[in-house]
């Protein structure tokens, strides 16, 4: 009942209007799994490689017909009659078939879409939700928790066409007792911010991840506007709401000058100066999480930042670790950061993603499951966060259905499990938040 009978791949459109890969895995008994791959804008140099056609006559070279044909003509043959419930075996067949370190032969976008579709089909064959199947693969059957969301409300950097340098300004509703309540709080603050921007005559257009994308004078102005928006609600900043930022510092770093350049403010910092700039922001505002606060290759800068801030702030490695357990192990050994951002397509298979999560947890590093800026309606990361009890999720703002699809799936899962079987720990999930 769980043998793979056929795999069908197709080219679909992501949230930025770019092509991506969708795979459909069919099993004996009529069970089907459907999954698609997301795509990033600010990417780590060591991420698994997306395969693009490079044909400028189609989709400005971003087509994925080559990846689709590799699934239909190679991966489907290699996986035919294999047991979909053996996720690790399936993923390693694809890894071996690819034969490269960064999945450049078949493409991480091709491999991931199949990997997730296999997991969904296997879950269907066991007549269980995806999150429950993931927990079983993860060797933690029946163990679940609901994640605290990082809700993006202002977009900057590569995620928006504005002059804000920091890529994401997020809120975390720490006083919420359930995921559903945290989502409601996020919606209310999102709308309060929209009204405030209108009052100020500012743009309420949104960026790639659904947060507002106004032109502002500085990163501090973004934090001040968020602070003012929260004051218009019944919630208190610091008590009910804490802040998180994603610097995406690799996008700010000039390797030749060894400087971090905030172009919107016309300021440059050395590595240490940038850490102290972030330290001052965290002293002025209740920031509990900073992601990619240094360039991905500036490990010395990350080590210094961890010494300065790691005991009081969640320091998250995204481009730094690229969901790679081996790179993460090196970071753990050196004492760099204290948390990891998990993105399925950075590594390219569900199995390797689970290995990275396990490695982080064993080292007492925080885990945040994340979307990408180019998303689809696929809500697998919601199930991944619950099935691995990862504690936090970052999946954009309260607009754009490619973002809200994940929040809505969390609401369904929480309703299905109930708080007894899937507790919501809120603030306790944030590393170094006390």
UniProtKB/Swiss-Prot annotation:
Q: What is its main location?
A: cytoplasm
Tell me which GO cellular component terms the UniProt record holds.
cell surface; extracellular region; phosphopyruvate hydratase complex
What is the reaction catalyzed?
A: (2R)-2-phosphoglycerate = phosphoenolpyruvate + H2O
Family affiliation = Belongs to the enolase family.
Q: Which residues bind Mg(2+)?
A: 246, 291, 318
Cofactor binding description: Binds a second Mg(2+) ion via substrate during catalysis.
Query: What are the names of the required cofactors?
Result: Mg(2+)
Natural source organism: Buchnera aphidicola subsp. Acyrthosiphon pisum (strain Tuc7)
Record bears the keyword Metal-binding: yes
UniProt binding sites for (2R)-2-phosphoglycerate: 167, 343, 372-373, 394
Q: Which NCBIfam families match?
A: eno
| Role | Catalyzes the reversible conversion of 2-phosphoglycerate (2-PG) into phosphoenolpyruvate (PEP). It is essential for the degradation of carbohydrates via glycolysis.
Q: Which Enzyme Commission number(s) are listed?
A: 4.2.1.11
The UniProt keywords, alphabetically, are:
Cytoplasm, Glycolysis, Lyase, Magnesium, Metal-binding, Secreted
Active site at: 209 (proton donor), 343 (proton acceptor)
What biological processes does GO assign it?
glycolytic process
Instruction: Describe its partners and assembly state.
Output: Component of the RNA degradosome, a multiprotein complex involved in RNA processing and mRNA degradation.
Name of the featured protein: Enolase
